[in-house]
Amino acid sequence: MNKKEFILDSLIDDDEAFTQIVEYFELVAEIEISSEEIKILISEMLEEGYITINYSWKNEYNEYPYSLTEKGRKAWENIQE
């Protein structure tokens, strides 16, 4: 999987905020990536329509979570491991 696909994978079961996506990369994906690079990827994925921001709640770090769009869910279904 590429880094954007790992972001999709982190969101498949539930909405996640930035901090949880960073933790996913550290703990699950075990990929070295900077927080800044994750921010850039998230921004690109928002623009591309793969994810959206869920403004209905914030986490303890005052971050809104991200959700998969239908386009993002379809992209996740087509990930080749």
Task: Please name every model-derived segment.
Residues Y64-E81:
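Short, amphipathic alpha-helical interaction segments positioned at domain boundaries
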Residues D13-D14:
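Short helix-capping/turn signature of helix-turn-helix
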